[in-house]
A protein has these predicted regions:
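Exposed, low-structure sequence patches enriched in small/polar residues
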Residues: 1-340
């Protein structure tokens, strides 16, 4: 196949005041089918889940629109940011799933057993998505803390097909959180945060149930430093999941810690011993939603390990180089050495 495209890019920006502005951006893009998707070859590595390519697959065309509004008041320290992203696609590359009710021949010598499924990429219209994120920040001077409030919403409309019947899966995510970020002094700072997301998935697939799940994250970071250069760092996070499939509704703690000392002249060097996942509870839990399936997964991840690091800060390198140049010029002005 051959493809041709017209891919426009447009941007509009307006500055309302010295503190606020808005930018709108549009871009057209394409998503080409892969070689594997175009090849009319049947994959039989898993007899229960056979896959096939589609040589008639077309490219997908996506319209993308982004809007960003910013407000910053440097005098009061307040700021507000709003981001909204919209996408729509024609000829969206999705998957068609056929579940055999009886043994079926799909190619010469290839039989799809009863209750097995055949997956094949197809083009479908109707894909849409929206995502947004809003954040507001304000300083609270009497406790030397910045408070950041954030909220967001995302939506995706995913077209698919099962047994020649078109289906639509709608996925909505609502999230919000708050962060208290403090820098009490040169020697003490902390960060306290809470975030929650509520996920709702609806599908028109036959016999499918609508699902909801909640993910909550609470975190605390504390950094302590003394005048002699010794420091202690702690980062503690709790992750809690509810509403997922059996075995994935869990709550666990992730604690990373470090101790070290700043050394050498002007404390340019740092020697630090870190331990990751002190409690050996780290996990990776996720839900993946596509046009035809909703999958909860739990993946093994690297748990507790230790790391010893040495860091040297070169921030004064340019100053030393300039000082050497000044010394050369100074000696030259004194007329040292033989002349011509």
């Amino acid at each position: 196949q051959s493809f041709s495209n017209f891919l426009p890019n447009l941007m509009w920006r307006k500055k309302f005041t010295a503190k606020s502005s808005i930018r709108v951006f549009y871009r057209g893009s394409t998503d080409f089918p892969s070689i594997n998707q175009l090849q009319d070859v049947v994959g039989q590595s898993n007899p229960l889940r056979i896959s096939s390519g589609n040589p008639f697959l077309k490219q997908s065309y996506t319209n993308f629109l982004a809007t960003r509004y910013t407000f910053t008041n440097s005098q009061t320290g307040q700021s507000f940011f709003a981001n909204i992203f919209l996408r729509s696609a024609s000829n969206y590359i999705s998957n068609a799933i056929y579940i055999a009710s009886a043994d079926s021949s799909i190619q010469q010598g290839i039989v799809l057993k009863a209750n097995s499924q055949l997956t094949k990429p197809i083009n479908l219209d109707g894909y849409k998505s929206l995502s947004s994120f809003f954040t507001y920040s304000i300083p609270v001077k009497f406790i030397k803390t910045n408070i950041n409030l954030n909220a967001g919403f995302s939506y995706s409309r995913l077209p698919g097909q099962t047994n020649y019947v078109n289906i639509i899966t709608d996925n909505k995510v609502y999230n919000g959180g708050v962060v208290f970020a403090s820098n009490i002094s040169e020697y003490v700072d902390f960060n306290l945060s809470y975030n929650a997301s509520f996920n709702n998935t609806n599908t028109t697939a036959l016999n499918a149930t609508n699902t909801n799940y909640v993910n909550q994250s609470t975190g605390l970071q504390i950094n302590l430093l003394d005048k002699k250069g010794w420091f202690v760092q702690n980062n503690i996070t709790n992750q809690a999941y509810s509403g997922l499939s059996a075995g994935n509704n869990q709550s666990f703690w992730l604690w990373n810690a470090a101790i070290g000392k700043k050394i050498l002249k002007n404390q340019a060097g740092e020697l630090k011993l870190s331990v990751f996942d002190l409690l050996k509870q780290n996990q990776s839990i996720a839900r993946v939603v596509d046009a035809n399936t909703i999958t909860d997964s739990q993946t093994k991840v690297l748990q507790q390990y230790f790391l010893l690091t040495f860091t040297y800060n070169l921030k004064n390198f340019g100053v030393a180089k300039q000082q050497a140049k000044n010394d050369e010029e100074h000696h030259g002005m004194r007329g040292g050495g033989p002349g011509f």
